[in-house]
């Protein structure tokens, strides 16, 4: 492409400081260095994790920054030494990379590649620099992806090449929310046929958990949320019954234990609230119940329960990106979507032009959207 090797000026949503709306700015995006890829984005989702960092609650939050981590686009140019991508490839950036070489990648028990973890947490690319500038200032990267920009640069291990026929305004969501919830049920909990599951929080991740539980053959899938408007939607994804904690005077874990003859086989916390994490564990059946933490809690918050809960056979687990080894799994998830094995379209409640990004955040905070997709 004629832009290869040159700085590209484009639109991006810059977070200048925590707690303030994003600002649409013209930014400069430098060409990719060795083992980096520059991408032209076509669509990006708006996720709670972006809002969490923007709020100032994230201990790793840095400003100014270009947020966003649910994107899809095409390769514009590649840096030196990049062999797996070429200009024009359809790609999804990955906030959990897969180098294939570190001890984490070589261990089948985890998907948490550590190759670039330190620099990613510092808002930089692996060579400890940023490719973004705005108004003469360096702007930080976010989660190694920064999809709230028309162009972004990512490490070549933080990218999946996917089916070029896939609609980018849908499959961008496989970069985070849907994959996270779906994999939590299939990979982390390994939900068994005939089981009873409880899902706390019926946003995009919770709905994806429900979808995973259904695919795994669970017979009872109980959705728990304070917003009854979400129940009808959850039913479409496979939930069989619902509980609104506001309708009960006793703690939610007691309600669930009574409903399920001693507790659920699997529970999932999709909110990021440490009190709910405890309730989700204590709603599990003695002897074999498993609770999976997916939600991200605020900086410095801690979980607690009585050790007896664990001594008597309950298991507490956590998961990131649904346990999927990203580079190899995301293309397969796209194929599952293309062959109608995986719902994605149903998660998209709003599609807005990129300039209306702050409206996307407002819809999410108001509980009016499952996922808003922004198109460039």
Swiss-Prot record:
Q: Which Pfam families match?
A: ADH_N, ADH_zinc_N
Site feature Important for FDH activity and activation by fatty acids: at which residues?
117
Q: Which domain of life is it from?
A: Eukaryota
Which GO molecular function annotations are given, in alphabetical order? alcohol dehydrogenase (NAD+) activity; S-(hydroxymethyl)glutathione dehydrogenase (NAD+) activity; S-(hydroxymethyl)glutathione dehydrogenase (NADP+) activity; S-nitrosoglutathione reductase (NADH) activity; zinc ion binding
Residues bound to Zn(2+) 1 are 47, 69, 176
* Residue stretches in coiled coil: none
Keyword Cytoplasm attributed: yes
Q: Tell me its family.
A: Belongs to the zinc-containing alcohol dehydrogenase family. Class-III subfamily.
Spell out the protein name for this chain: Alcohol dehydrogenase class-3
Please spell out the taxonomic lineage of the organism that makes this protein: Eukaryota, Metazoa, Chordata, Craniata, Vertebrata
């Amino acid at each position: 492409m004629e832009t290869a090797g040159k700085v590209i000026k484009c639109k991006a949503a810059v977070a200048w400081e925590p707690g303030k709306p994003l600002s649409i700015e013209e930014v400069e995006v430098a060409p990719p260095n060795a083992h980096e890829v520059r991408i032209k984005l076509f669509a990006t989702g708006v996720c709670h994790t972006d809002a969490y960092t923007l709020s100032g609650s994230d201990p790793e939050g840095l400003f100014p920054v270009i947020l966003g981590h649910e994107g899809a686009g095409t390769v514009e140019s590649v840096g030196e030494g990049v062999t797996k991508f070429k200009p024009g490839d359809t790609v999804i950036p990955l906030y959990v990379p897969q180098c294939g070489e570190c001890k984490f990648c070589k261990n089948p028990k985890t998907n948490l590649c550590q190759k670039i973890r330190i620099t990613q947490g510092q808002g930089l690319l692996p060579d400890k620099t940023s490719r973004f500038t705005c108004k003469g200032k360096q702007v930080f990267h976010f989660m190694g992806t920064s999809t709230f920009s028309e162009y972004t640069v990512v490490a070549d291990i933080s990218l999946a090449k996917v089916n070029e026929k896939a609609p980018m305004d849908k499959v961008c969501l496989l970069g985070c929310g849907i994959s996270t919830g779906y994999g939590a049920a299939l990979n982390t909990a390994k939900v068994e046929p005939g089981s009873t599951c409880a899902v706390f929080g019926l946003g995009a991740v919770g709905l994806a958990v429900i979808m995973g539980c259904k695919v795994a053959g669970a017979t009872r899938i109980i959705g728990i949320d304070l917003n009854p408007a979400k129940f009808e939607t959850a039913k479409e994804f496979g939930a069989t019954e619902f509980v609104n904690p506001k309708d009960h005077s006793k703690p939610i874990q007691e309600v669930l234990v009574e409903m399920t003859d001693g507790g659920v086989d699997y529970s999932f916390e999709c909110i990021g609230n440490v009190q709910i994490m405890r309730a989700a564990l204590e709603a599990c059946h003695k002897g074999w119940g498993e609770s999976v933490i997916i939600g991200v809690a605020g900086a410095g918050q801690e979980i607690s329960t009585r050790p007896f809960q664990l001594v008597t056979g309950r298991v507490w687990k956590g998961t990131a990106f649904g346990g999927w080894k990203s580079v190899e799994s995301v293309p397969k998830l796209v194929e599952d979507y293309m062959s109608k094995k995986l719902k994605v379209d149903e998660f998209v409640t709003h599609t807005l032009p990129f300039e209306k990004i702050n409206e996307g955040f407002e819809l999410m905070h108001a509980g009016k959207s499952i996922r808003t997709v922004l198109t460039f």
